[in-house]
Design a protein with these regions (language model features):
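Structural/interface elements that position substrates and couple domains in central-metabolism enzymes
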Residues: 1-206
Length: 206
């Protein structure tokens, strides 16, 4: 049983099966959807928060997609040994897209908040008060704006979707561009507010 957990473009698990089949022609891999194989291959994206990896490996739901139904069942049986959350079965492509969609969703929502902060700055509106008031609507939950998007995943994963379908990803691409441009906007605001010879201390900069 081989399980890929790394965030990957859609189709990566299938490519992995073909690579392994070429390297080991003596073994049968699920390269064409057949179940009569010796090696089962599946994709199950990791969903962990740095600093809480061990706890979330056990408690979080897992999306498990095999290249065949038998691959999915075998991988699901493995995760049920230690996962307390739900183990939800699907196919490999859907599981791959699921992880990319989760992080792209977060990126788009962060971009809305970041763009709102830029607009409010131009219109002389307190963005924090605005968001607090808007979120009093029972179906509105605007996130807090910041200096961009960090981490290993959110700033990277949306580009996998954009690359796979560039003509249909205008929103995802724009969100990435908004968040990528926010650090420069923040630096420019700081530079304009500083006096000549000012000293700047950066706390928590990594």
């Amino acid at each position: 049983l081989i399980i890929l957990e790394s965030t990957s473009p859609v189709g990566t698990t299938e490519m992995l099966a073909h690579w392994l089949a070429d390297l080991r022609p003596d073994l049968r891999f699920p390269v064409s959807g057949q179940d009569d194989v010796e090696v089962q291959i599946a994709y199950c994206p990791e969903r962990v928060l740095p600093g809480q990896v061990m706890r979330e490996l056990i408690s979080n739901d897992r999306i498990i997609g095999g290249l065949t139904q038998r691959c999915t069942a075998r991988a699901t049986d493995f995760y049920r040994i230690f996962v307390e959350g739900d183990c939800v079965a699907t196919n490999a492509r859907t599981a791959e897209m699921c992880k990319l969609s989760e992080n792209s969703f977060r990126d788009v929502n962060i971009a809305f908040a970041n763009e709102l902060s830029i607009i409010c700055d131009q219109l002389d509106i307190n963005v924090w008060e605005l968001i607090q008031l808007a979120n009093r609507h029972p179906r509105v939950n605007i996130l807090q704006p910041g200096a961009g998007v960090g981490g290993h995943c959110i700033a990277v994963d949306p580009w996998f979707i954009v690359a796979s379908s560039p003509e249909n990803t205008r929103l995802i691409r724009t969100a990435r561009e908004v968040n990528d441009g926010k650090p420069d906007w923040v630096v420019a605001k700081i530079a304009n507010a500083m006096e000549q010879g000012s000293t700047v201390a950066c706390f928590g900069l990594a």
